[in-house]
Each structure stands twice: as structure tokens, then as C-alpha cells.
Amino acid sequence: MGGNKKSIRPIPLDVEKEIKSSKFIGCEKCGGSGFIAIKKDGYDFQQPCDCYRTYQLNMIKERSNIPEIYVNAAFDLDKSVSFMRFRPLGYKDELREIDGVKVNRKQLYFKKPIELNINGFGQQYVDIAINDLNASPRTISRSLILSGTVGSGKTYFACAIANEFINRGMNVCYLKTKQYLDNVIKDSFTKDEQKVRELKKKRDYLNGFNKNLKDNCHLLILDELGYEYQKADNNFALAEIKDLLRNRAEKSLPTIITTNFMLDELTRTYEEELVSMFAQSYMFFYVVCSDDYRIKKSMDLDKGFDFDSLME
């Protein structure tokens, strides 16, 4: 009977707009519609075509803000990269002097590190983190802090994780701490009316941008934590960072932080509230490369050249 048949589900409006802009023209599977009609159990459905899935992934990647140099980052780090897990041991009070005043601060101490296979961990992390994100309700976010010197490969590894998230259809955002703070911290005391209007427009945009980071982004990469201490108003900068990280932790959304700070530096530098959040929601790792990883990657630049034939 006709009552057993369900009409084909209409194509979403946002997809219709993309179809009209000829995003899928030339696809033989769907004829340029982006969707394929299928029949299952007597019902007609519209199933996204492979070309539409590819388009979706490309859009997620484009919006992610991942630098071009890392768009193909993958779990292919070689054995020159050591990857060590530091488990928190507990807190210890220490007497420090800040601006000439002696104060007690708690420092987070760690157990002896365990060396791990960095590529294997990356694959496991993606599987587990996405499984946590898909849980209802979300009760845990497994965030990472990747500490290491310049050129150790920590940003490459963070972006390899981000790319795998994207390949699985998850929203990702990459931010350099400098980029984030330079956009957020503006001079609000200008008397120039035009600048005031421009500033308000930017802040309205940033409020929406920040809300997206806090509420909708499945994975945030925050690169080069520690930059905020180079700002003239580092108290405001630190408050912005803390607010961003706290909101994501409260919503059980994972964040990967990279920093040049050593782990003991990190826990001594930041206030107790932030250190406590790190201990509760973040896994600590130290990345070491026997050579500068960026120099190793630059060897690829020589491919295709026959330098021997050019020698006089």
C-alpha cells in the first residue's frame, strides 16, 4: 500500500544553496545534487554522496585555521621523537617571592615519566576522545598539555590529532595564543568615534567567535601557551585564557595546549586555580626530538633536485 512508503526527505536549505553555487556539478554518482536516493525497508531516503562528504570535510578543514604547513600532519613521527607521560604526584607548598613579597604557592610534582610510542598514542587518543564526546551526557574531557623545546614536533603532533578529528567529521579550531589575545585585547579607551565603532563591531564578532570556541568546537588546539606573559596587561590576558579553558572544561570539550614551558615551570608560573584545572582535566606530556624536527622536515625540500649534476 502507498501508506507504507515515506516520501523522500528534502535536501537541507544550506545544502541547496551550495548546490546552486555549483559545488557538486560534475559528480556522476549524484548528478550534481550532492545526495543519492536510496531505498531501505520500503522507505525512500536521501543519502549524502561521497562528493558532499568530501566537501564537508574540506569546509571543516578550512574553518579549522590549521596553518598550511600542518594541513597534512599525520601520525608519522619517527623514532627521533621521544614522548614521555608525566603523571601528577601531588602538591607541595613552596615559598616564592613575587614583586618583593614572599608568598606560599603550590607546585604540582610529577612521578617518573613513562616513554610511549607517540604515533600509537595519537591513534588511541583520537578514538577515546571522540568516544567521550559522543557520550550522553559527556562526563569527561581528556585534554593534553604538550611541553617541549622549540622544534620538538609538539605542534606537528597536535595538528596530526586535529586532522584525524577532521577526517571523522569533528569541528576543530587551531589558535596561536598570540593570535587569540591580539584579537581579544584592544584599546577600549580611544576617543576616535570611528575606531570605537570598529572596535565594537570586532568585539561583537569576537563574542560570537569565543562562544563558538567554548560551546561548539569539538577540539581546540591552543598553541604556544605562555605568550600572555609577554603582554603589557598580562593579568587581563591570563583572565581571557583562564575563562576560555574553564568553559571548555565545564562542557567536557577537549583542548590540546602546546607550550615551551617545562612542566615544573608551567605549574610554578600559573595560579593555583589554573594549575588545579590542569591536574584534573589535562594529561601532561613532554616531547623531545634528538634533532630539530622542523629541520628534519625541511629535508623534503631537496626532493626532486639532482645537486650532484650541478656541482662544478
PLM regions with names:
Residues 1-124, 293-312:
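A short, basic N-terminal segment
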Residues 87, 113, 118-123, 166-216, ...:
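Short glycine-rich substrate-engagement loop in P-loop NTPases that contacts/grips substrate
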Residues 128-141:
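Phosphate-binding P-loop
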Residues 140-158:
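Walker A/P-loop nucleotide-binding motif
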Residues 155-170:
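P-loop NTPase Walker A phosphate-binding motif
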Residues 170-171, 216-219, 251-257:
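Loop/turn-to-beta-strand initiation segments
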